[in-house]
Amino acid sequence: MKLLAVRRLFRIQRVVIRYRLDDLLFALPLPWWMLAVRFVLPWRWLPRRKSELSRGVRFRLALQDLGPIFIKFGQLLSTRRDLLPEDIADELMLLQDRVPPFDQQVAINLIEEQLGARICDVFSRFDETPLASASVAQVHAACLKTGEEVVVKVVRPGLKPVIGQDLAWLFILARMAERVSADARLLHPVQVVMDYEKTIYDELDLLREAANSSQLRRNFEGSDLLYVPQVYWDWCRPKVLVMERIYGLQVTDMAGLADQRTDMKLLAERGVEIFFTQIFRDSFFHADMHPGNIFVSTVNPWSPKYIAIDCGIVGSLTPEDQDYLARNLFAFFKRDYRRVAQLHIDSGWVPAETKLNEFEAAIRTVCEPIFEKPLKDISFGQVLMRLFQTARRFNMEVQPQLVLLQKTLLNIEGLGRQLYPDLDLWSTAQPYLERWMRERVSPKTLFGNLQSQVEQLPHIAGMTRDLLERMSRPHASDPPRPWHERKDEPVLRLIGAALLVGGAIQGWVMSEAATQLLTLTAWPAAIMLIAGLYLIVRR
């Protein structure tokens, strides 16, 4: 294993030298002792041919040479436009995850091992030549004994050791970058590699992908917008996924779409509607919607329907994130930059101590030039990217779900404008957002929220008792500071006030109840009142 790791290191070094990636490294603001290293690197003494390749192209070619794990890492980096220079991010978008298929017999043996049955006992037909092959898995067409046409996705054998080895080197490089460069620390390279580690290992678990596909299919059951293939759970395993085979046109097949007279304007608008439906209605979105994973049904081209596959990567937003995102978009298009800044602080995306006026000015400086364009030409994805870039200067915490959202929005937006160049994303999205905002404050929604809060009332007494017990325990080795010196005094007093008010309200509500219920439910209110008084008056 150690020998393989050393060989891999030499391979990485050769690729770095070949594409002169050290030029990219030494262009960064590094400590003097790191910059001095360039004078002792032997290959920098040798005469070099003038390269006509840009730094972005060299970086992309280097990742391609290093193999599929680095290719997928580059694809992940391409979504982080808030971290990368634009020229490098554009080049990384061109990375293609295509590798030669592995041996057919190996695939068959692995499928039979996972299913615990022979191929001929499960499938009436199995095509040994794969339909597609990528770094993590390859796909074969087949037909179940029951007659359904399916595809069989099988994970490449022996991937985990290779992934572990490459991830180890990526972590080493990321930690080195954080130690030697203050600028690198702002980009959180270790966190980026950790996000990639989770993504790549999630993709190795095909049961997770099957569950994601089933959820997305259920969300759009009977919809005119999107179709998701059926998963055949009886034949799904951690390394094998069997699902319905779909037939449709690749979404980028403009000639094919034109031949069947597809309504391109409606198709583009429905793509936007699918995105906002996933974000705001379901809070569950397909986060890998590049053109290779999207098809268009050949049925009813005048009312076109999308087909989505490969749900290995999905994202979700909390209700709070949904609300702040919608309000941010409305505030931005009203040019209310103070509101945008305040929402970032209120949401916790940037630190609470951020100076609101400075943050507002920075957002205005970055975003005001965008409005020089007609509204239909403004890119939602670029808006989010600019906002994230600005917020990073104010120590915005990396929000993985928002990164996935930005990536998905850029894909959907780019695809929509490719289908219909005059697509006005804001006009298409605005009615949906306004309807969602109205529903958020509708009596039905408010009643549902109130009901969920009432369901928590029985737990309050237990939580209060636990709080009082913890506060009454003696401190064995670290005696507490005097009450008036404690930094959390205002917070605890605020909690005390909340308990006092909550106890009073609960007592009033229960006093309206029947007498037989009163004796059973009055004691939680009493405990809340006592706890609140204790926290407020204690010295």
Curated annotation (Swiss-Prot):
Active site positions: 288
Signal sequence coordinates: none
Pathways per UniProt: Cofactor biosynthesis; ubiquinone biosynthesis [regulation]
Disulfide bonds: none
Pfam families in the record: ABC1
Keyword vocabulary terms for this entry: ATP-binding, Cell inner membrane, Cell membrane, Kinase, Membrane, Nucleotide-binding, Transferase, Transmembrane, Transmembrane helix, Ubiquinone biosynthesis
A molecular function GO annotation: ATP binding
Domain Protein kinase residues, every copy: 125-492
Gene Ontology cellular component annotations, sorted alphabetically: plasma membrane
Membrane topology: Multi-pass membrane protein
Subcellular location: Cell inner membrane
Taxonomy, superkingdom: Bacteria
Enzyme kind, highest EC tier: transferase
TM region positions: 23-43, 494-514, 517-537
SUPFAM superfamilies reported in the protein's UniProt record: Protein kinase-like (PK-like) (SSF56112)
Any one biological process term the GO annotation gives: regulation of ubiquinone biosynthetic process
Chief location category: membrane
Binding residues annotated for ATP, in chain numbering: 131-139, 153
E.C. number: 2.7.-.-
Main function: Is probably a protein kinase regulator of UbiI activity which is involved in aerobic coenzyme Q (ubiquinone) biosynthesis.
UniProt-listed PANTHER family: CHAPERONE-ACTIVITY OF BC1 COMPLEX CABC1 -RELATED, PROTEIN ACTIVITY OF BC1 COMPLEX KINASE 7, CHLOROPLASTIC
Family: Belongs to the ABC1 family. UbiB subfamily.
Protein name per the record: Probable protein kinase UbiB
